[in-house]
């Protein structure tokens, strides 16, 4: 078995999807978990205004609405968290995403003071962190806030990770990857866009250039320039299509070099 086939099998990506069916599958997946865990009453997503969080949040809102109707239980809620670091440069996109999602509840927590406080404490101890490390601090602080809200709201922290991120390791260990459940894990980027389009998401949101925007020294830097390969090519690889050798080598090197991010902690 080639490495490509092994990765596809492991990540569970389908070569083609029917958006309506995938939307139903994602909602049913979330519903089933909540029904089987009666103490959980809310779904929590950090909404950035990007494709991944917009889709995940919309699916969660649909799940909460469906459960309220089917179970006649108004305690099922979706909570959207706004977690900017200082001023968010694409604030309009985030507001547009919120209007599209229509969350039951919204909490706004600016993480900048917490991140800088942590950095200051490290500096006092003699540890000077780089801009890159500070970026990871932001991702982990956001996840910390989500779990705090989840703990107080009988909630489940829902991940926004997908197969195109997973294969490249383009996420922060114990940051955006540290979630309870992940409904879109088997989708690639173009499939995420298809689902958003099917749900009548504003076009500028599902066509938006993906960016993590974690580093202060590289604001608004898009994912593809960091990865060295486009999501379109990554998606084709995940759909078992033939791609150019250079891109294949980049993708497979990224996968192999980030195995530790996808594995459980090492034990004896």
UniProtKB/Swiss-Prot annotation:
Annotated ATP binding sites: 46-53, 160, 189
Instruction: Write down the SUPFAM superfamilies for this protein, in alphabetical order.
Output: Adenine nucleotide alpha hydrolases-like (SSF52402)
Keyword terms: ATP-binding, Ligase, Magnesium, Metal-binding, NAD, Nucleotide-binding
- GO CC terms, sorted: cytoplasm
InterPro entries (UniProt xref):
NAD/GMP_synthase, NAD_synthase, NH(3)-dep_NAD(+)_synth, Rossmann-like_a/b/a_fold
Q: What is its EC number?
A: 6.3.1.5
Give the record's GO biological process terms.
NAD biosynthetic process
| GO molecular function list | ATP binding; glutaminase activity; metal ion binding; NAD+ synthase (glutamine-hydrolyzing) activity; NAD+ synthase activity
Which reaction(s) are listed as its catalytic activity?
Answer: deamido-NAD(+) + NH4(+) + ATP = AMP + diphosphate + NAD(+) + H(+)
Signal peptide positions are none
Similarity remark: Belongs to the NAD synthetase family.
| Subunit (UniProt) | Homodimer.
PANTHER family the record matches:
NH 3 /GLUTAMINE-DEPENDENT NAD + SYNTHETASE (PTHR23090), NH(3)-DEPENDENT NAD(+) SYNTHETASE (PTHR23090:SF7)
What task does this protein carry out? Answer: Catalyzes the ATP-dependent amidation of deamido-NAD to form NAD. Uses ammonia as a nitrogen source.
Q: What is this protein called?
A: NH(3)-dependent NAD(+) synthetase
């Amino acid at each position: 078995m080639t490495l490509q086939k092994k990765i596809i099998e492991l990540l569970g990506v389908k070569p083609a999807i029917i958006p309506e069916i995938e939307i139903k599958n994602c909602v049913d997946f979330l519903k089933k978990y909540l029904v089987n865990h009666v103490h959980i009453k809310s779904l929590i997503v950090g909404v950035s205004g990007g494709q991944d969080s917009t889709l995940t949040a919309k699916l969660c809102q649909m799940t909460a609405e469906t459960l309220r109707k089917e179970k006649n239980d108004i305690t099922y809620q979706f909570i959207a968290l706004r977690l900017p670091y200082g001023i968010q440069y694409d604030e309009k996109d985030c507001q547009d995403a919120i209007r599209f999602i229509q969350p039951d509840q919204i909490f706004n927590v600016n993480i900048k003071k917490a991140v800088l406080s942590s950095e200051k404490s490290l500096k006092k101890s003699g540890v000077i962190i780089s801009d890159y490390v500070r970026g990871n601090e932001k991702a982990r602080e956001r996840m910390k806030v989500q779990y705090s809200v989840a703990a107080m709201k009988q909630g489940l922290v829902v991940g926004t990770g997908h197969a195109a991120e997973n294969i490249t390791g383009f996420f922060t260990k114990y940051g955006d990857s540290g979630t309870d459940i992940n409904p879109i894990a088997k989708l690639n980027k173009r499939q995420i866009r298809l689902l958003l389009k099917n749900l009548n998401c504003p076009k500028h949101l599902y066509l938006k250039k993906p960016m993590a925007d974690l580093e202060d020294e590289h604001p608004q830097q898009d994912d593809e320039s960091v990865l060295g390969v486009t999501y379109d090519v990554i998606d084709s690889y995940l759909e078992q299509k033939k791609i150019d050798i250079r891109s294949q080598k980049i993708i497979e090197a990224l996968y192999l070099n980030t195995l530790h991010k996808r594995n459980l902690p090492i034990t004896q």
